[in-house]
């Protein structure tokens, strides 16, 4: 029986970049890793209403640079940037080093796996039928330019006595092609019957080696 590896992890260093980019020796590595986990947990909790897709952390010298990818940048920034300044001060307390926070807008939340998974989970919490929630998310993704999408929900679906898994797919989702740009994310719906797990795979097309090199060069130029 075949086992499915995490689509993000298997593509790291090939078409995916790490979400924490820093170096530490063995004595400091665990401390910095724990800091990253705490910062991410804090930001996801604090910005629950801001539709946060991912958080990237860089540590140049004795500083930290945090990039928040969100579908609602206005909620994160606040009036005249007040909210982002408060956020920077709170993260500075957690990390103990100067922190710079950048906000990047997610232009198409319909084809962002994390945001789609959270949207389906929120609908399940509001007692929307799981098939309807899945169908709506898939239609929106395909309209926004996705080449394929697969959604799986697991748990006591519709309040059933026995937990089960149901999935639906539209288009194609190649999991074994490394150059295939497959975005993968999970979310949890906390319902009165228990926890329902949501998994989302979104295929956006292929990224060829030339495009990867170009992307890396553009990144270096921006720095």
Curated annotation (Swiss-Prot):
The keyword Cell cycle does not apply. One of its GO terms (biological process) is translation. Gene3D superfamilies: 3.30.300.20, Ribosomal protein S3, C-terminal domain. It comes from the Bacteria. InterPro entries: KH_dom, KH_dom-like_a/b, KH_dom_type_2, KH_sf_prok-type, Ribosomal_S3_C_sf, Ribosomal_uS3_bac-typ, Ribosomal_uS3_C, Ribosomal_uS3_CS. GO terms for molecular function: mRNA binding; rRNA binding; structural constituent of ribosome. Keywords: Ribonucleoprotein, Ribosomal protein, RNA-binding, rRNA-binding. Pfam families: KH_2 (PF07650), Ribosomal_S3_C (PF00189). The keyword NAD does not apply. One of its GO terms (cellular component) is cytosolic small ribosomal subunit. Part of the 30S ribosomal subunit. Forms a tight complex with proteins S10 and S14. PANTHER family: 30S/40S RIBOSOMAL PROTEIN S3, SMALL RIBOSOMAL SUBUNIT PROTEIN US3C. Binds the lower part of the 30S subunit head. Binds mRNA in the 70S ribosome, positioning it for translation. Belongs to the universal ribosomal protein uS3 family. This is Small ribosomal subunit protein uS3. The gene is rpsC.
């Amino acid at each position: 029986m075949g086992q499915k590896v995490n689509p993000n992890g298997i593509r790291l260093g090939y078409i995916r970049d790490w979400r924490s980019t820093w170096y530490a020796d063995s004595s400091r590595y665990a401390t910095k890793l724990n800091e990253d986990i705490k910062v991410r947990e804090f930001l996801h909790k604090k910005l629950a209403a801001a539709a946060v897709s991912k958080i990237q952390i860089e540590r140049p010298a004795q500083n930290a640079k945090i990039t928040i990818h969100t579908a609602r940048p206005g909620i994160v920034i606040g009036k005249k940037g007040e909210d982002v300044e408060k956020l920077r001060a709170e993260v500075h307390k957690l990390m103990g080093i100067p922190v710079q926070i950048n906000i990047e807008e997610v232009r198409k939340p319909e084809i962002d796996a994390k945001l789609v998974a959270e949207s389906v989970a929120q609908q399940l919490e509001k007692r929307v039928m799981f098939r309807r929630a899945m169908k709506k998310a898939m239609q929106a993704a395909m309209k926004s330019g996705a080449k394929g999408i697969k959604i799986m929900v697991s748990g006591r679906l519709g309040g059933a006595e026995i937990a089960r898994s149901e999935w639906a797919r539209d288009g194609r989702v190649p999991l074994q092609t490394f150059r295939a740009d497959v975005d993968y994310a999970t979310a949890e719906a906390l319902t009165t019957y228990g926890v329902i797990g949501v998994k989302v795979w979104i295929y956006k097309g292929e990224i060829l080696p030339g495009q990867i090199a170009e992307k890396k060069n553009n990144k270096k130029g921006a720095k």
